[in-house]
């Protein structure tokens, strides 16, 4: 059976700066929300930071970004399009970060402080890796 193809759209590689700018804005929002102990906002901003950072990386290096209905599909696209010694580790990290999105948005309880702080560390590490490759 052939591997599932991830839906994606083509973009001019110079457009990566738009997505990096969004990632940095979401990162700042995550930090600000964390300082105010707004854990739901901090968590969701962190997830969106990584989505935009992934878009920046894929657009710059491959001229594409995911257009799938599932954010998790970006993990497969990242593995298929980015060549780096840390890709497996960082793709796993991205998958774990993205898995938090539904918990933060749709579960009928607040995102716990402990989870938000752990997520913040993962986001910082993932964004650092992305910026190194840009």
Per-region residue spans from a language model:
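Terminal alpha-helical segments
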Residues: 1-134
């Amino acid at each position: 059976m052939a591997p599932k193809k991830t839906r994606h759209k083509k973009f001019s590689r110079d457009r990566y700066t738009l997505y990096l700018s969004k990632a940095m804005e979401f990162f700042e929002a995550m930090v600000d929300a964390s300082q105010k102990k707004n854990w739901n906002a901090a968590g969701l901003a962190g997830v969106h930071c990584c989505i935009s950072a992934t878009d920046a990386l894929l657009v710059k290096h491959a001229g594409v970004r995911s257009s799938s209905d599932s954010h998790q599909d970006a993990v497969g696209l990242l593995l298929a399009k980015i060549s780096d010694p840390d890709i497996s580790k960082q793709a796993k990290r991205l998958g774990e970060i993205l898995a938090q999105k539904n918990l933060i948005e749709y579960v009928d309880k607040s995102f716990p402080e402990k989870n938000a702080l752990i997520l913040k560390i993962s986001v910082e590490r993932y964004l650092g890796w992305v910026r190194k490759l840009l």
